């Protein structure tokens, strides 16, 4: 198994406020570990940001199939500030799982995510 460290970034997103935009989809035959994520406000006023994990893979817990969950929900980010989520924690993505980003204002949050893909 090969372990490949990568950075996934998007200068501004989402294209439309209220419509989450895909940042990353775990490729086929790959397990991805999210190592960290930073969201930066590039707007002239405070924004709120949401990060979702969209998963339909087999569940190992209460449900037979995983569902969409929030990693961050409507968190305020002040002007010129950034917000680090998952500080010290990891999230595992299976093939087809997605990370989606939303913001209260279109194209006003910049996102950087560090990952490790295991193939």
Descriptions of predicted regions:
Residues 57-98:
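Intrinsically disordered, low-complexity Pro/Gly/Ser/Thr-rich segments with frequent PxxP/GP/PP motifs
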Residues 32-34, 46:
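Short gly/pro-enriched beta-turn/loop segments at secondary-structure junctions
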Residues 42-45, 56-58:
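Acidic glycine-/aspartate-rich tracts in secreted/extracellular proteins
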Residues 54-59, 118-119:
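Short edge-strand/loop segments of extracellular domains
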Residues 39-44, 104-106:
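Short solvent-exposed strand-capping/beta-turn motif centered on an Asx-Ser/Thr pair
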Residues 50-54, 112-114:
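Beta-strand signatures of extracellular beta-sandwich domains
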Residues 1-32, 95-96, 102-119:
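C-terminal interaction-tip segments
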């Amino acid at each position: 198994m090969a372990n490949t460290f990568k950075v996934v970034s998007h200068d501004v997103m989402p294209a439309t406020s209220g419509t989450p935009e895909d940042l990353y989809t775990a490729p086929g035959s790959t397990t991805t570990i999210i190592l960290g994520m930073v969201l930066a406000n590039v707007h002239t006023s405070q924004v709120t940001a949401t990060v979702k994990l969209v998963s339909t893979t087999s569940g190992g817990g209460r449900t037979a199939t995983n569902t969409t969950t929030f990693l961050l929900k409507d968190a305020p980010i002040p002007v010129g500030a950034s917000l680090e989520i998952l500080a010290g924690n990891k999230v595992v993505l299976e093939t087809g799982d997605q990370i989606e980003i939303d913001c209260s204002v279109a194209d006003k949050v910049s996102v950087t995510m560090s990952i490790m893909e295991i193939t």
